[in-house]
Amino acid sequence: MSKRTRQYLGLLSAVLAYYIIHEGAHLIYALITGTFKQINIMGLGMQIDIHAERMTDIQLGIFCLVGSIATFITAYILVLLVNKIGDTPSKIFKACMYYITIAMLLIDPVYLSVLCGFFGGGDMNGISLLFPELAIRIVYGIILAINIAVFVKIILPKYQLAFSK
């Protein structure tokens, strides 16, 4: 299989994994709190719709926060497993895990520190019910800086070595 095909499969797997983990966390919380309404498919994306009127502000804030917590935890599990992933013989698997790791490390911190101000609040609207928006943006900006450093110092070199084998 060509390198380009592996890259496309890796990118597709990252998008799917992100939606499963991030939106899955929202779904689980909505089901636990009895506020699940429906799953909305929008273009290439999806969103968990809830009965927000049945939630307290704290519950709504937690609902909006759990997606990024789930991707954060997943990202660092993948960071911890980078050596084992790199030792697998399958270049397709390594490509998929590489792009999934990038997605888990970067998407939510980029969105919640910078992009939410340009593209609508999304999860920020709910999280800001728990904490001031500026504080959230600063915290996610710090997480983003740390995650970029982890990517540059750990993930990128390990995968470069793994793909050279």
Where do the language-model regions lie?
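Metalloprotease/metallohydrolase-associated module, dominated by Zn2+-dependent proteases
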Residues: 48-162
